[in-house]
Design a protein with these regions (language model features):
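C-terminal motif of bacterial Sec signal peptides marking the signal peptidase cleavage site
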Residues: 6-10
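Sec-dependent N-terminal signal peptides
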Residues: 1-3
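Solvent-exposed, polar/charged alpha-helical surfaces in well-ordered, non-transmembrane soluble domains
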Residues: 30, 34, 70, 74, ...
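Sec/Tat-exported extracytoplasmic proteins
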Residues: 36, 43, 76, 80, ...
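Second-shell loop/turn segments in exported
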Residues: 17-23, 62-73, 82-92, 122-127, ...
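N-terminal targeting/tethering segments
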Residues: 13-123
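PPIase-associated folding chaperone regions across multiple families
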Residues: 13-15, 118-195, 245-353
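Peptidyl-prolyl cis-trans isomerase
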Residues: 198-248
């Protein structure tokens, strides 16, 4: 019987079941494997030559393999540091927090369980390394940078950042094409374009004069062409970082407009007519400051990099974590490698230009 038990359990060892310990907490080996996988994915975006395996290159002056291993251990340090800050700040997980943790875990597990099981990452390890970490990290951030926190960001600072960074606008469009009775797309005739141009110029005038809102004008246009799809959009965007999602002429026009101004714009390169309204960014900021969730999102944009750097540096100073080096060293990052991870040399050189 002892021989049978030994044979059945020969591949399992309590000594290899855990990756790190701190105080009364023990992180399963799956936590380390998860972070090793994440570090490998991060490394793919850091190497100079994406057409070659990361293991054959250096990252930040380190051998690629060693960088990945070190990064995984640093992630465990950060996980424990977040736990420490969470405790120091007197925070706790509410029922809603627990539900969010369960939801995050289930969502990821639903599409990646097969791969994670293959690597040896249990669902409980995913929950600890990913879901619980995210929720605790966010609560620590909010406690530090939110109202009453030790690094509280004032409304004045938020307003200065927000109004200097974002542009609030609305628009709706008319394509140069139309749909025939068979559902096929056809180009407008010159006469049809001229008619659409006149209509859109009229909409711009009505909105500017206060006779219509942008949304109402878009609804009237949608009804006039018997369409089930609205082209109306209301957005607040950092045009310096996300302007590439819009036609260049659109961005240029928007930047040149005054707040409250409404304009008809013909963009032949986009094959569309536009009606655009540039709104008051100050009024939009008032809405943000009055909503705790939106306010925190802006603070995250302002302070996320600073907070991330501070947390990682502080985490490296933790000296009471015990790593199970014999277990950790038995996992090679090459286990995650796939041929599809490599980018062709032509694509790589094009992306770097």
């Amino acid at each position: 019987c002892l021989c049978l038990v030994s044979a059945l359990t020969g591949c399992y060892s309590e000594d290899k079941a855990w990756s790190a310990k701190r105080g009364d907490d023990t992180a399963a080996i799956g936590v380390y494997i998860y972070y090793l996988s994440s570090a490998y994915s991060e490394a793919l975006g850091k190497v100079e030559d994406a057409s070659k395996p990361v293991f054959d290159q250096e990252i930040d002056g380190k051998d690629g393999t060693q960088w990945i291993k070190d990064r995984a251990k640093e992630s465990i340090q950060l996980m424990y540091y977040v736990d420490q800050r969470f405790e120091d700040l007197g925070l706790s997980l509410s029922d809603d927090d627990q539900s969010q943790i369960s939801s995050l875990t289930s969502n990821v597990w639903s599409y990646s369980s097969s791969q994670m099981n293959q690597y040896g990452i249990a669902k409980t390890s995913l929950e600890k390394a990913y879901s619980e970490f995210i929720v605790k990290y966010q609560k620590v951030f909010q406690a530090m940078y939110g109202k009453g926190g030790e690094k509280e960001v004032s409304d004045d600072d938020i307003r200065t950042f927000y109004e200097d960074t974002y542009t609030d606008f609305e628009y709706f469009t008319c394509s140069y094409t139309k749909t025939d009775e068979d559902g096929k797309s056809q180009d407008m005739t010159d006469d049809e374009k001229a008619k659409a141009k006149t209509e859109f110029e009229a909409y711009a005038t009505k909105v500017q004069d206060g006779d219509l809102t942008m949304k109402k004008a878009a609804e009237e246009y949608q009804k006039s062409i018997d369409s089930d799809t609205s082209t109306y959009q209301s957005q607040t965007v950092d045009l310096e970082t996300n302007g590439s999602y819009y036609p260049d002429e659109f961005v240029e026009k928007l930047k040149s407009m005054k707040e409250g101004e409404v304009a008809y714009v013909d963009l032949p390169d986009s094959n569309k007519f536009y009606v655009i309204q540039k709104n008051s960014i100050s009024k939009k900021c008032d809405e943000v400051l009055a909503d705790d969730s939106q306010r925190l999102n802006v603070i995250a944009t302002m302070k996320n990099e600073e907070n991330s750097n501070d947390m990682e540096e502080a985490a490296k100073k933790l000296d009471d974590i015990t790593f199970n080096d014999s277990a950790i060293n038995s996992y090679d990052p090459k286990m995650f490698y796939k041929d599809s991870d490599l980018v062709s040399s032509e694509s790589s050189s094009t992306a770097s230009e």
